[in-house]
Amino acid sequence: MVDAITEFVVGKIDNYLIEEAPMLIGVKDDLEELKTELTCIQVYLKNVEVCDKEDEVSKEWTKLVLDIAYDVEDVLDTYFLKLEKRLHRLGLMRLTNIISDKKDAYNILDDIKTLKRRTLDVTRKLEMYGIGNFNEHRVVASTSRVREVRRARSDDQEERVVGLTDDAKVLLTKLLDDDGDNKIYMISIFGMEGLGKTSLARKLFNSSDVKESFEYRVWTNVSGECNTRDILMRIISSLEETSEGELEKMAQQELEVYLHDILQEKRYLVVVDDIWESEALESLKRALPCSYQGSRVIITTSIRVVAEGRDKRVYTHNIRFLTFKESWNLFEKKAFRYILKVDQELQKIGKEMVQKCGGLPRTTVVLAGLMSRKKPNEWNDVWSSLRVKDDNIHVSSLFDLSFKDMGHELKLCFLYLSVFPEDYEVDVEKLIQLLVAEGFIQEDEEMTMEDVARYYIEDLVYISLVEVVKRKKGKLMSFRIHDLVREFTIKKSKELNFVNVYDEQHSSTTSRREVVHHLMDDNYLCDRRVNTQMRSFLFFGKRRNDITYVETITLKLKLLRVLNLGGLHFICQGYSPWSLPDVIGGLVHLRYLGIADTVVNNLPDFISNLRFLQTLDASGNSFERMTDLSNLTSLRHLTGRFIGELLIGDAVNLQTLRSISSYSWSKLKHELLINLRDLEIYEFHILNDQIKVPLDLVSLSKLKNLRVLKIEVVSFSLFSEETVRFELLVKLTLHCDVRRLPRDMDLIFPSLESLTLVTNLQEDPMPTLQKLQRLENLVLYSCVYPGAKMFINAQGFGRLRKLKVIIKRLDELEIEEEAMPCLMKLNLDNKDGATKLMIPDRMRAFV
């Protein structure tokens, strides 16, 4: 992994040499030499890792290289921080002015020469201790293959609940049993790690039958640091909006009573994943009412004494191991997918490896993912390396081999997963923005950095290191990290000072990134030495906080690239509530600022100082004042409700803009927004003095890369005198006063896959809409017109899968027999039977 970090730093030197050349006065040659030395060391680093050199000399040598790499990054970033501050004071534009005062240049020159000496010393140690001699037989690591992942994207890679079909049927019956047998109200799923307890519980939780049967459904995970009070508070918070401060004041017994009162007389399902303590289980029994409403509780546990209590109301379900046949079927589907000819020798090696997986699904799928990337002539080498370590294959060994098999960018992406909380549903778009902001992703000739990052994440899915939660149209939307994988990434990240997950027991850290889950209070700052070289600080959770905590942290962290404070509420005496601390304006290296759901209601002027900012995530917040972001030319993603005027300069890099008023939109230079992909425009009625500007298709059609468009305004027309075409638009949502649809909508929107219309149509839209060849999802809502009749002919909607029609006074809906052959869901608002339905029998089951 040290080679990945070193390669990352070498890439950073390259970026500085290319983009900041005018600022590197007198140091360019020395920096080039340093880069060359580090590049040469790369070869030895890779060999040390691939050959599994674990002797003390090799470990110490790699640590020296890691320290140098981090120090190089510190020297460069600190130097440019000083230059930025000086230019800001002088009021100069950085790229057009060369500093005449060479004081800082001399300082960095001394630092670089020191680093060069240290690098040469490390190189000499290679020869002195023979670290560079690698003649023994070894497994050759493959590089990450970004484009090869494309071939796997068409396949759904969600984790299969292998061998658990019968288990799921049995437990589903017990969940839905309404025959008055209320003796069983808690199901305990028991088994060792890697058997699929969580997968089985989640399959039950997400079952359509379960969703329909239970009024309330709650899923909570018991993390390592979680106590019984935390479990109770999480369940309560999932059920109702309750102040966290109020809950914290309650004793455990009071929380039990409070939760009991909430759920009394309710039909609920509560799942508590990975419970370890009998005391916590007894508390849940007291808090969760066992009533006659058919409510159920599911727990998963690896602790037998927790699973097998004496309570007759608890049904314990033991998960079995996979049979060899089940394990082999699971393995060969993935491992042999791209091998054209599987000979007997390859099958023999594969079966020997599968036999050693011990019937554990997790171990088997990770092994299959690893072998799917290997050429047939490499299989024996992998099997030999696994047998050397142990008679049995442990999943941690497979994680290690998979990790070594990755290219350096994929390694960085994989280890970065350690920032997310346990059982967290990772939003792929957010992760992509974070990876780009960290500088881990390089632009490709054919793809944006975001597209490259997405392929890396798909690669992690392909090799079974993450578990898919949601896809839309094959596009990965979210995933989860298995506990064992998360433990591996946290351990590796800590070893490399890459990421530190805050623990109350440790008061300081030397890691480049720190993440805080749930807690940020006096304990966090008390006697804590903050690492001033930190590049990222991320907070996950929801908490009302004194603004001074954030000020204290950010005041010391001048080199931050990523600052995620989503969920914090900034409150402090002497400050107006709901504002950001001024010290954030001094973080000139910042690429990602996350302030989602922080109740911030204005963006201070200092935001314009953050001119390298790529992502500003302010979703969940509304800004009524004018917001000037015209200096942020690197901005790629902007989210928040910008009610007041929003000023954006020549934002050619902007890809996401959600959401902007129609007035502000009219003031922008649309022709410059060449990379905009996702756009939301609203008409905010809160500002009476704001001029309402009608929207038209012409201005929007200039956005040649637009994929997603949402418009919520009164005055909007789909008609245009000019010929317009939205070649790449796949999703369109219109909430406006549209009376008619243009007959050539299929020509205007040739790629449209999802359409939502909340309008006041005066005629049947189906003759027009059914010509949209790629449409798969259609929602018509609140469309009122007299004598309303709709007709879909036999050739209509060839690809439509979901149709939802919520129309007042719809008199008649006729669908011909052969129409919509792909339809899977039909939702009609016809409970009172007022609409005459003339539809095929096959569709009546959907209604």
From Swiss-Prot:
Gene3D superfamilies per record: 1.20.5.4130, Helical domain of apoptotic protease-activating factors, P-loop containing nucleotide triphosphate hydrolases, Ribonuclease Inhibitor, Winged helix-like DNA-binding domain superfamily/Winged helix DNA-binding domain
InterPro entries: Apaf_helical (IPR042197), Disease_R_plants (IPR044974), Leu-rich_rpt (IPR001611), LRR_dom_sf (IPR032675), LRR_R13L4/SHOC2-like (IPR055414), NB-ARC (IPR002182), P-loop_NTPase (IPR027417), RX-like_CC (IPR038005)
CDD domains given in the database record: RX-CC_like
Domain NB-ARC: 142-446
Organism: Arabidopsis thaliana
UniProt free text on domains: The LRR repeats probably act as specificity determinant of pathogen recognition.
Keyword annotations from UniProtKB, A to Z: ATP-binding, Coiled coil, Leucine-rich repeat, Nucleotide-binding, Plant defense, Repeat
Function summary: Potential disease resistance protein.
Ranges in a coiled coil: 26-42
Key word 4Fe-4S present: no
Repeat positions for LRR: 587-610, 612-634, 703-726, 749-774, 807-830
Official protein name in the record: Putative disease resistance RPP13-like protein 2
Binding site for ATP: 191-198
GO terms for MF: ADP binding; ATP binding
Transmembrane segments: none
Family per record: Belongs to the disease resistance NB-LRR family. RPP13 subfamily.
Lineage: Eukaryota, Viridiplantae, Streptophyta, Embryophyta, Tracheophyta
Protein's GO biological process: defense response; response to other organism
